[in-house]
């Protein structure tokens, strides 16, 4: 699902999307979302509820990503991201949801510099990491 936030924006700005494979796009008019159908069917309420939930989840994910990217150093970005994953998993053990290359892209750092920082963090006893499996041992206190 994409572009759901554009339906509620009061602008005529365009939207560009490049699909990796053939696909269909369903356009839903803003008026069909905000106005109830004459029968007030349950399907309409479900669509609206799902759309609001989806927008909320995307907003939360973007907020978390922005929180990570706002950190200055690679270590601070990794620490923030690992702390979020630990909190979501309610465990100091978790599996990274993607490869180290994708992690470096996600936190906007050079992959080799990130790998060196992970090694330093491991050597300092902050984390244990094997492939995508991470165990938090201790993290620096927030400044």
Positions of PLM-derived features:
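Internal, well-ordered alpha-helical scaffold/interface segments
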Residues: 31, 49, 53, 57, ...
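Basic, amphipathic alpha-helical hairpins
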Residues: 36-44, 62, 85-91
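Cyclic-nucleotide recognition modules
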Residues: 1-52
């Amino acid at each position: 699902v994409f572009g759901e936030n554009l339906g509620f924006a009061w602008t005529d700005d365009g939207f560009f999307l490049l699909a990796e494979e053939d696909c269909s796009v369903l356009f839903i008019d803003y008026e069909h979302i905000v106005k109830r159908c004459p029968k007030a069917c349950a399907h309409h309420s479900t669509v609206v509820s799902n759309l609001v939930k989806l927008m909320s989840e995307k907003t939360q994910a973007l907020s978390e990503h922005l929180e990570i990217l706002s950190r200055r150093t690679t270590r601070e970005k990794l620490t923030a991201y690992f702390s979020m994953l630990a909190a979501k998993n309610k465990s100091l053990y978790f599996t990274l949801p993607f490869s180290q290359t994708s992690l470096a892209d996600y936190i906007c750092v050079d992959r080799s510099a990130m790998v060196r920082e992970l090694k330093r963090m491991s050597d300092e006893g902050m984390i244990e990491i094997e492939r995508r499996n991470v165990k938090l041992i201790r993290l620096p206190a927030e400044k």
